[in-house]
A protein has these predicted regions:
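ABC-family P-loop ATPase nucleotide-binding domain
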Residues: 1-28, 325-336
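ABC transporter nucleotide-binding domains
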Residues: 19-24, 29-226, 231-232
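Preference for bulky hydrophobic residues occupying beta-strand positions
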Residues: 29, 42, 250-252, 283, ...
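Short, surface-exposed acidic/glycine-rich loop or hinge patches that mediate macromolecular interfaces
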Residues: 83-86, 230, 255, 285-288, ...
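Short phosphate-engaging motifs
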Residues: 88, 214, 257-258, 290, ...
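Structured loop/turn residues at secondary-structure junctions
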Residues: 145, 155, 253, 286, ...
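ABC transporter nucleotide-binding domain
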Residues: 192-285
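Non-catalytic connector elements of ABC transporters
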Residues: 270-336
Length: 336
């Protein structure tokens, strides 16, 4: 970041505005007869990774486009670090960067040339542009392909370059729209580490994703979006807890003890256990404090356990519970 850009961003942010990166109330966007976004409220604290999770066509990209000043809301309002996205467009744009679902790069140029051009356009000197391009190519594992034209890049390599181009100047607020779409598992994990480093060095991240494991691994908070609305919001743990209790798994050392273990579990836990397979007893943990009593009762009955484990509801279960059957994608809904 140049000295001039740093000074501008420092003046815009101000110490009194550092608590909240995004505040949105009642955001609405209508395309024809379709309310693509229908009264969305968001509150994104500074210095966190915040995920918008939802199926295709849920409205995630439209929300991003309104928050980044690319679309004007038809209702509601939103502020970035206290600055209105409609009335203070130019100020907001100095505080953000956006990586979309398609790369804004020139296939006829090399990776290094693309990054240097972006850097020069952002106000870096020629030497700063060269240095920053080299740093980003190394950061995203593209140094060996620095001089290769993009028409010879794989989809995953292009995705990494697209993210790198958006980080030439690290903005206080970074929007990542499906940042790991099309990447192989190893590259996805590398990208996650890069995203975590951005937050560690001072940025706030708002990302959209369809990958449940990605939201679970990365996000401090998640808003589940379905049919243009926020249907749930919270930490991954809070969302899992909201749809059901954790499940206790008791693997018995001897299968012949199964019936007695079920009887004791039902008596102590006050719930109905199940036996999904021989020598395995499972029960919802309606009252976690009673688990210790159960273990004592099983020991007194001389029932030995091979293993004891507790399983939380998964984010997959949260997603399916909140967005119907988990298979609806609303492909008929077109987001610009």
């Amino acid at each position: 970041m140049t000295t001039q850009q740093s000074e501008v961003r420092g003046r815009i942010l101000g110490p009194e505005q550092g608590g909240s990166a995004i505040e949105a109330q009642g955001l609405v966007k209508i395309f024809g007869d379709n309310r693509a976004v229908d009264g969305v409220d968001l509150s994104v604290p500074s210095g966190c990774i915040y995920a918008l999770l939802g199926p295709n066509g849920a409205g995630k990209t439209t929300i991003i486009n309104m928050l980044t000043t690319l679309l004007k809301p038809d209702g509601g309002n939103a502020k970035v670090f206290g600055h209105d996205v409609v009335h203070e467009t130019q100020v907001v744009r100095q505080l953000i960067s956006l990586t979309g679902q398609s790369a804004a790069v020139d296939e006829r140029l090399s990776a290094s040339e693309n990054l240097r051009i972006f850097a020069l356009l952002l106000g870096l000197s020629r030497s700063e542009a060269n240095n920053r391009a080299a740093e980003l190519l190394e950061e995203f594992g593209l140094a060996d392909a620095a001089n290769r034209t993009l028409d010879k890049f794989s989809g995953g390599m292009r995705r990494r370059l697209d993210l790198a181009s958006s980080l030439i100047v690290q903005a206080p607020l970074i929007f990542l729209d499906e940042p790991t779409s099309g990447l192989d598992p190893r590259t996805r994990i590398q990208m996650w580490e890069s995203i975590r480093r951005l937050v560690s060095s001072g940025s706030t991240i708002l990302l959209t994703t369809q990958y449940l494991d990605e939201a679970d691994q990365l996000a401090d908070r998640i808003a589940v979006i379905d049919r243009g609305r926020v249907v749930a919001e919270g930490t991954p743990h809070e969302l899992k807890a909201a749809i059901g209790k954790a499940t206790l798994h008791l693997q018995l050392a001897d299968q012949k003890d199964t019936a007695e273990a079920v009887r004791i579990a039902q008596t102590v836990l006050k719930v109905k256990p199940s036996t999904p397979e021989p020598a395995l007893v499972t029960a919802p943990m309606a009252d976690p404090d009673r688990v210790t009593d159960l273990l004592v009762s099983l020991r007194e009955a001389k029932i030995q356990l091979a293993t004891v484990s507790v399983e939380e509801p998964t984010l997959d279960e949260v997603f399916m519970a909140l967005t119907g059957d988990g298979k609806q994608t609303e492909r008929g809904v077109t987001e610009p």
